[in-house]
Amino acid sequence: MPPKKKIAALVKVQLQAGAATPAPPVGTALGPHGVNIMEFCKAYNAQTESMRGNVIPVEITIYEDRSFTFITKTPPAAELIKKAAGLQKGSGVPHKEKVGKLTKDQVREIAQTKLPDLNANDIEAAMKIVEGTARSMGVTTD
């Protein structure tokens, strides 16, 4: 078994799927660690090509020898809620001013998408988490 690489840093960024460029935020996040930014952009874009149009969080593990690995997550719940409700952004005063509405089916669909990344055992618990996020954005659920 080869010796384990020592981890130098863990960087988390949210990027448009299939559209990462060496410009900020990628360059500013990876530059100080001496990682080949173009190499990361190519690998990330290739892996997220099928999810274009979504914001995809990525966790980049940078090792001491300047190599890296990355894990893509599911899109943020807030992004999925905005897309489902057809909104540009959430409410500025969420508990007073409601800006949209989601059906139970839409909430279930979002929860299904987010389930691998959520700390929930079943779809019902995941739906409650998504409903809470929607509430804090000023979106009502039936």
Swiss-Prot record:
One of its GO terms (biological process) is translation. GO terms for molecular function: large ribosomal subunit rRNA binding; structural constituent of ribosome. One of its GO terms (cellular component) is cytosolic large ribosomal subunit. Gene3D superfamilies: Ribosomal protein L11, C-terminal domain, Ribosomal protein L11/L12, N-terminal domain. Transmembrane segments: none annotated. The keyword rRNA-binding applies. It comes from the Bacteria. Pfam families: Ribosomal_L11, Ribosomal_L11_N. Part of the ribosomal stalk of the 50S ribosomal subunit. Interacts with L10 and the large rRNA to form the base of the stalk. L10 forms an elongated spine to which L12 dimers bind in a sequential fashion forming a multimeric L10(L12)X complex. HAMAP family: Ribosomal_uL11. Forms part of the ribosomal stalk which helps the ribosome interact with GTP-bound translation factors. This is Large ribosomal subunit protein uL11. It comes from Nocardioides sp. (strain ATCC BAA-499 / JS614). The lineage of its organism: Bacteria, Bacillati, Actinomycetota, Actinomycetes, Propionibacteriales.
